[in-house]
Structures are given as C-alpha cells and as structure tokens.
Amino acid sequence: MMLRVLVFFYFILVSSSAFSKEIPVIVISAGKTPQSKSTVGSDVTVIDSKTLRNSNEFFIGDILDNKLNGINYFQSGGYGTVSGIQLRGQPKRYTTVYIDGVKASDPSTPSNDYYFNNLISGSFDRVEVLKGAQSSLYGSGALAGTIQLFSKKGRDGHNNDINVSKGSFDTRKVDLSFDGKENNYDYFVGFTNFETAGESAMRDNDEKDGYRNDSLTMNYGYNINENFRLENYLYYND
C-alpha cells in the first residue's frame, strides 16, 4: 500500500492587477506570476477544467498523453503500476512536477522522480505544461520543462457535487466535493474513490490485476487584503 500526504501552508503575494481585471487565459508556470498566455514566449500548454472534466480518462498521466504532443508517457502495466513522463525526449529526471506551487518531485532521489500512477484528475482545476529548459526559474531538474497542477478552488456560495462513472472490468469512480466562497475566504474539499477488478498485464494469464485508489484534496484560502492571500493545502493519496 502506498500512502502519500502533502500539506502546504504559505503566503502568496499577488499583484493588485490580478484582481482588477479578468484575463481569459492566464498562465503562472512561465514566469511564476499570473500573465496572459499570449504574452508568454515559452512553449506552454494549459489543460483547463472543462477538458479535465470531459475527458474519458481518469488519471492525469493518461490525459496528458492524449492531449499533448512532444511528451512520452510510459507505464509498466495496468492501473497503479509505475509510470512517468518525459518531455521533448529528455529523461524523466529533467521534468519537475509541482502541485499548487509546491515541488512534488522527490528531490531525495537521483532521478528527481514523480510517478503519475496514482494521480486522479477529479480534484484538479487545470494543468500547465511548460516545455523547454526552465533551469533559471525551477532549477536543474527542469531542463526539459515543468508540469504544474492546480487544485480546484471554492466557487461563490456553498456547493455540493457528486459524479459517478462506471466502465468495463468492474471499473467505477466516485467523485464527491464540497466547496464555497464567501467574503474573503474560500474552501474546497474533494474525495475520489476509484476501483477496478482489472485485467492481467501478462498474455495468456487469467489472473486479474485489481486496483483501488482513494484520494482527498482540501484547500482553504483567505484574502488578507488586495495584495496578500493565505492558502492552506492538503493532498492525501492511498
């Protein structure tokens, strides 16, 4: 059983202009501050919430593999097996992964590893893929680029959502979420359960490779004033 818990707590300094007008498509990864995609010189692709929601795939790695050119997504077997992403043909150690601005790639390993096999799309709002050398911004582990994932935030009012999907091999996914936004604060709580009886990864073998994944995402944000925002994140995967 694999258990991963990420807890994030930090302050964000935001330019007041970010609140004064709405930009149709913005990116953060290209310069670490919100900016219009049309002004970015780097090769950046944004997979928005609508694309994630309408995808037939359950996992982030599979969605990136289907939607992007110039990447190599590999997996050693069925659901839950070791997987990784290469950008522009470079070894995967040169692609750094961030979740809500916090580095998720394991710096303690020589290969700067991050495995996408347990990363379900249900609680994420968008993904930014920045291709090309980004060492000046993100260090030597980003020679091929970065992949940044941003979790969902609370919407106006108080909202409850449930989504149930079912497929072959007794595959089913349940997404539950609660979110809200009022005055200066917003929150989001999302839980996803994914289960499948699976199929054998070996030829001429009837033994099924079953898999189960439970993930929990929580975040809370508070706008202290026009320039400062406090955010707390928790990401749990079992």
Predicted regions and their residues:
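Boundary at the C-terminal end of the N-terminal hydrophobic targeting segment
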Residues: 18-20
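Periplasmic-side early beta-strands and strand-to-turn transitions of outer-membrane beta-barrels
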Residues: 136, 148, 156-157, 165, ...
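Short acidic/polar hinge/loop motifs at secondary-structure boundaries
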Residues: 103-131
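Transmembrane beta-barrel outer-membrane domains
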Residues: 78, 117, 122, 140, ...
